[in-house]
Amino acid sequence: YPLRRQRQMCIRDRATAAQYLKAGRMPGTLAHVRKVYAERAQAMGDALRKELGDAIEFVQPQGGLFVWARLTGAGGKVADGNVLAKRAIEKGVAFVPGTPFFCANPDHATFRLSFATADVDKIREGVARLGQAI
C-alpha cells in the first residue's frame, strides 16, 4: 500500500502547512528569510568582486538563491566553467557549470553559484577558495 501511505503523508503535510498559515506566522517568516538571503546575496557579490575581480562578470541578484556568472579569461585566468568546476572541487568548493542550462550552443564560460545554504562566513571562504582555483 505504498500509494496509500503517500496520500496520507500529503494530507498530513497540507494540514501542517494550513495550521502554520492560519497561525499568522508567514509574514514574520518571510521577512526573516528575505533578510537572510539578501545578506547572503550581498556577501556573495562583495566577495566575488573582491576575490575574482575582472576574472568574472555577474549581475548582483535582487532575488532568488543563485548568482549567474561568466568567466572573462582576464589576465590569462580560466575561461571555462567546466574546467573551473574541477579545480574548485580540489579546493573544497562546488558549483554548477552553466552549460547544462542551455538548450543549444552553451556558453562554456558560465556558471551558477548558490548562496542558499551557506552562511556569510562560509560564502566568503568559498569564494576565496574559488579565487584560488581560478
Protein language model features and the residues they cover:
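Single conserved hydrophobic/aromatic residue that forms the stacking wall/gate
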Residues: 1-11
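Structural motif of enzymes handling amino- and sulfur-group chemistry
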Residues: 12-33
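Conserved glycine-rich beta-strand-loop-beta hairpin in the small C-terminal domain of fold type I
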Residues: 18, 31, 35-45, 57-71
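Residue-level recognition of strand-loop junctions within catalytic nucleotide-signaling folds
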Residues: 22, 70-72, 116-118
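Short, conserved charged micro-motifs
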Residues: 75-84, 121-125
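PLP-dependent enzyme catalytic core of the Aspartate aminotransferase-like
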Residues: 90-91, 104-134
